């Protein structure tokens, strides 16, 4: 929990069980010192128990369900490390990201033979579909994990837990690789012949680059480069440049959501490898976005353009977040002031458009808050604001996200039974089901805020 020496244990009550036995033991302690709690099951589907331990350390926690005839289920064992006193104040966001990810994995991950994300909770099923999420949602879950893995580094209560999940997460997303047209890329669903989108791939490529930065393991860099090579196939001469949105079935429009993150990935790969080709393409993609996709009246970005140069003028928050991040990275690499100026212009307009003044009873103050329900879009927008904050130190934008997440956690946005968050909360509603796409985005934002908190920023 957010307090020292406490563990919050949650579980799903199995059908037919009348009680759940929870036992816990400090790792390395004698078995006879095991503490046990027996919890009678009422009508709730999910149970929980707050454990207060006497000393810090890693605890082995075991759960066993018991039915009316005294038959015991197989033991389910996990390890957990409570916060130490000195960690409490500085790990508020990390603790919440961990609670959300733990609940999300328990409820939605590994429910099929693919060992991947189900699309939502309650679990999605159907006569012609096993409920496994499409690759966009799989990628959102991965992004949340990667951000949380990074935030946990150096924090004893969490680091090992998320490092130990690395292989499982890596293998899970790679089950979506297909080899259509003699090239490897992530498909909407496993098996050749399924749709493949360039934007689905670039988000995963960015996660792979971030995993490489965390671990320096070449397997992650190889996948980031695989995605880059795939993006280059979609970088045709039509529409003046840019990257196609979809490969299969064939599609002719170029999109901001495929081209802008490609510029970010190009910058990341250049920073990792120092190979000039990545930087050259990043600059090219960014220039194309400015020339063709940016609205000169407010500096925000349109959605797509056709080969006849007709522009689809819808504006989505993430489509401005990625050019902002690309501009920041290009400024860091080149030192050219125009990139920083443009990033700051985008930031001002994005903040004006996608945030609203809100009077929070939970926080007891007014602040600018997220004003839309597509939380995944906002998580990508946040990446741009964070990159800018690292350069100019202006905290207004980051504070808006910080207070939005604090208020969400403390309000009816957080379901008290599942600990999942309602993406509809920011438009005045709550959810009856929770999509991995948005829950992964919530985890990512909490984790990235945790890094700032841990660094005292």
Question: Where are each of the predicted segments found?
Answer:
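Recognizes extended acidic, P/S/T-rich segments that occur
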Residues: 19-56
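Beta-strand-rich modules
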Residues: 51-74
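Edge beta-strands of extracellular beta-sandwich domains
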Residues: 74-80
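Extended ligand-binding groove/face enriched in aromatic
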Residues: 160-272, 276-283
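Active-site cradle of extracellular carbohydrate-active enzymes
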Residues: 259-262, 266-269, 278-330
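Conserved aromatic anchor
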Residues: 5-17
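Extracellular interdomain linker/stem segments of modular secreted and single-pass surface proteins
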Residues: 81-86
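CBM-like carbohydrate-recognition segments
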Residues: 88-139, 144, 148-164, 168-199, ...
């Amino acid at each position: 929990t957010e307090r020292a020496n406490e563990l919050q244990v949650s579980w799903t009550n199995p059908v037919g069980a009348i009680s759940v036995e929870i036992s816990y033991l400090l790792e390395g302690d004698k078995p006879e010192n095991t503490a046990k709690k027996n919890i009678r099951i009422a009508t709730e589907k999910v149970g929980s128990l707050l454990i207060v331990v006497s000393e810090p350390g890693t605890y082995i926690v075991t759960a066993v369900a018991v039915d009316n005839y005294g038959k015991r289920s197989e033991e389910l064992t996990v390890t957990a490390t409570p916060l130490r006193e000195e960690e409490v104040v500085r790990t508020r966001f990390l603790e919440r990201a961990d609670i959300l990810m733990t609940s999300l994995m328990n409820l939605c991950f590994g429910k099929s033979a693919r060992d991947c994300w189900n699309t939502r909770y309650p679990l999605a099923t159907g006569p012609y579909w096993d409920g496994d999420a499409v690759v966009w949602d799989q990628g959102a879950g991965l992004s949340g994990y990667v951000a949380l893995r990074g935030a946990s580094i150096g924090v004893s209560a969490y680091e090992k837990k998320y490092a130990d999940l690395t292989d499982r997460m890596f293998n899970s997303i790679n089950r979506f690789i297909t080899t259509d047209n003699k090239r490897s890329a992530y498909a909407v669903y496993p098996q050749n012949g399924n749709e493949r989108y360039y934007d689905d791939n670039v988000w995963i490529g960015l996660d792979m680059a971030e995993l490489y930065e965390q671990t320096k393991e070449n397997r992650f860099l190889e996948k980031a480069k695989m995605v880059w090579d795939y993006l280059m196939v979609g970088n045709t001469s039509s529409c003046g440049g840019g990257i196609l949105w979809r490969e299969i079935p064939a599609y002719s429009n170029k999109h901001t959501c495929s081209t802008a993150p490609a510029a970010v990935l190009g910058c990341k790969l250049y920073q990792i490898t120092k190979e000039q080709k990545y930087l050259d393409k990043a600059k090219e993609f960014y220039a194309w976005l400015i020339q063709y996709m940016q609205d000169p009246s407010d500096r925000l970005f349109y959605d797509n353009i056709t080969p006849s140069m007709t522009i689809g003028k819808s504006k989505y928050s993430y489509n401005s977040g990625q050019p902002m991040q690309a501009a920041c990275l290009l400024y860091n690499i080149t030192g050219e002031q125009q990139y920083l100026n443009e990033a700051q212009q985008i930031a001002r307009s994005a903040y004006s458009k996608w945030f609203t003044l809100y009077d929070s009873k939970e926080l007891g103050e007014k602040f600018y808050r997220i004003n839309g329900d597509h939380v995944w879009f906002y998580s990508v927008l946040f990446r741009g604001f964070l990159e800018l904050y690292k350069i100019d130190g202006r905290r207004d934008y980051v504070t808006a996200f910080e207070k939005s997440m604090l208020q969400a956690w403390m309000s009816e946005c957080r379901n008290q039974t599942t600990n999942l968050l309602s993406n509809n909360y920011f438009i005045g509603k709550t959810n009856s089901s929770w999509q991995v796409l948005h829950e992964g985005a919530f985890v990512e934002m909490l984790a990235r805020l945790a890094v700032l908190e841990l660094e005292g920023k």
